[in-house]
From Swiss-Prot:
It comes from Shigella flexneri. This is HTH-type transcriptional regulator MerD. It holds the Pfam family MerR_1. Residues 6-25 bind DNA. The gene is merD. It comes from the Bacteria.
Length: 120
């Protein structure tokens, strides 16, 4: 098992320390242990979760929905975790549909059609 400090976790996930601390406050992450000095220690599962949360956030999933999912997973409440996973999946599908609609609109723009017509 790897052990990470906040700064190591942030570095490995490609985010700032401020993001990691914000996610800690929101309940998206939690340390597996604390040092005698009170510093959080994180494991590979925390790194994986941080990468997931960041990817979901960048894809347009709100931190509130992600926090509800993480709390359910941390509580080992299978029914609640399944319900929150369904909510996040629904948000992902809505985002996919919105992006597909946007892509169709972009394709119908005059500049896009002119570019396609100019291709050999």
């Amino acid at each position: 098992m790897s052990a990470y400090t906040v700064s190591q976790l942030a570095h490995n996930a490609g985010v700032s320390v401020h993001i990691v601390r914000d996610y800690l406050v929101r309940g998206l992450l939690r340390p597996v242990a604390c040092t005698t000095g009170g510093y959080g220690v994180f494991d590979d599962a925390a790194l994986q979760r941080l990468c997931f949360v960041r990817a979901a956030f960048e894809a347009g999933i709100g931190l509130d929905a992600l926090a509800r999912l993480c709390r359910a997973l941390d509580a080992a409440d299978g029914a609640q975790a399944a319900a929150q996973l369904a909510v996040v999946r629904q948000l992902v599908e809505r985002r996919r549909a919105a992006l597909a609609h946007l892509d169709a609109q972009l394709a119908s723009m005059p500049a896009e059609r002119a570019h396609e017509e100019a291709l050999p």
